[in-house]
Structure formats: C-alpha cells, structure tokens
C-alpha cells in the first residue's frame, strides 16, 4: 500500500512539474508574448460574440456572428492588408487594450513572472505602454521600466512594429481632430501623417501649409478650425452625428472659409467635379462611399491620378472583395453595433 501511494505521488509530482514547465513556457518562453496576446484576443472575441448574440440571436453558429462584424473582421483585414504601411493608433489594429497602470511600480509588478502566472491583468515586457492621455509613440514595457518613466500608463497587448510607418495613422480618420492635426504644418510631415510618404514634399505642404499656414494669425487659425469641423461633417461619422447637428452654423461658416477665404478649392474639388483639381476631391470626404472608392482605386481621377504613392488599388486588382473593403471602411468609421451601457 505504501509503495502504491508512493508511486501515485511520484506520478502526481511529475504531472505537476510538467504542467509547471508548460505554463512557464507559455508565460515566459520565446513565443510567450504572442501566446498571451492570442489568449486575450480569443477572450475579446468571446465577449463580442456574446454581445452580438444577445442583440441579434444566433442563426447558425456563434462564430458566424463575427463574419459580418466590422469591429472584429475590419481590424483583422486592416492588420493583414494595410498595417504594412499604415498604423491604427500606432499599432496594427489588433492590439488588446489593457487596464491602465497608475504607477511605474504597478507596471513592473504586473509584468513580473508571478503576475504572468496567476493574474488576469498581467503585462508582458514585450508589449507596449505610453503615458496616458497622450498620442506619444508606444514603447515596449521593458523600455518604459528601464527609463523609469513616471505613470500613469496606457498599456496594450501588441508587439512594437519593426518598421516605421509609410502612410498616415488611420485611427480617428476624418474626425475633427484628425483633420485639424492634418492642417498643422509640423504634424502633416510627421510620421503620424505624411512624413513617410512622397506627399511630404508635395504642394499641400510646400505651397500651403509651410508657405501660408505658418504665417496665419489667430483669426486665420480660427477659420482652419471651422474648416476641419465642416470637412469632418462630410464624413457623416456615426459617433459625431450629435456634434455635427449641434454645430450646423459653424459647419456653414467652415464651408464658406473652405471655398472662399482659405481657398481650398484652388486645388481640391468640393461640391461639384473639377477636372483641373490637383488634390483629392473633398466632396463627401471620409464618408463610407468616399473611403470605399479610394481603397478600390486611389488612382481614380477623384483622388491621386498622377501622384499616388504606393497605395494599391485593392478593388481594381481584386486584392480585396467589395465586402472586405466595406468591413475595413465600417471599422475605421466606428460604424458597427455596440451594446447599450
């Protein structure tokens, strides 16, 4: 009997040791950052399926709910086809947002081995963090800890991109703030916008932003603010509908500044076709159809017929289907179901 019990403990001990080693590989091995992120991604998808099922019911399988869901599929398609050049808030679109870390000590504790073994809010050292309430560049958690930066920190489960972006960051595309920052000379040529493209040396920067906007006084800059509001209203973004309705008068003023005072129509069509326009057509800028048309063929006469910079014609070349382009578009615009809170 004693021998049998001893053998049992040996087997149990061996099983426990193997379990420990397997768990250690999962949380600290060479591929641990990817593994832990995949676990979080699966959990996120499960929560999304639950939300969609409660609202719409299940026609066939739970996973079928995700096939037509822009929030999940749009992000995946973006990561697969767009993130080699573009970013989405500095990552590939598939980052999992984690609980903020209020202090450096908290971030260090959450990234430790013990936390990764047992805690649900653990952070891998290879994931990314940055100061909260900023649009600063993401750094690896390890780099933040080594630099002893003061918190609080936003933290995401995502790997740091190997290469610098070669096209604009599309988080918030066509929102008021995104457009207003686009009209800032320094931001226009930054990596967040066109710093990695040939457009940084184009007429938009050289003849307008650098030559004119840098000399604008307060009144001129106020007109640019109104133009950003008016141009963003062209997108008809779902998350901005109430603000656009409330700011109808400001939008009308912005349209006037765009067409008259600032003279955007010297280079862009707006409201009606202009065969002599050098820049993209601003009519419906950022709207669902505008984005779809652009992704299908950026070299169309409405966009960049002569100076497209490496953007593939995803529709013309059949790289993406119409449905896939629509999913990416709706995801970028935030046009998808969200449960009421």
What are these regions (language model features)?
Residues 34-72, 79, 87, 112, ...:
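Sequence context of c-type cytochrome heme-c attachment sites
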Residues 2-29, 70-71, 75-86, 176, ...:
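C-terminal substrate/ligand-recognition segments
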Residues 87-116, 126-129, 156-184, 190-212, ...:
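Gly/Gly-Pro-rich "capping" loops immediately C-terminal to redox-active cysteine motifs
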Residues 74, 78-89, 107, 124, ...:
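The canonical Cys-X-X-Cys-His
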Residues 83, 112-115, 119, 146-150, ...:
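Sec-exported extracytoplasmic/periplasmic mature domains
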Residues 1-65, 143-152, 157, 215-231, ...:
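N-terminal export/targeting leaders of redox proteins
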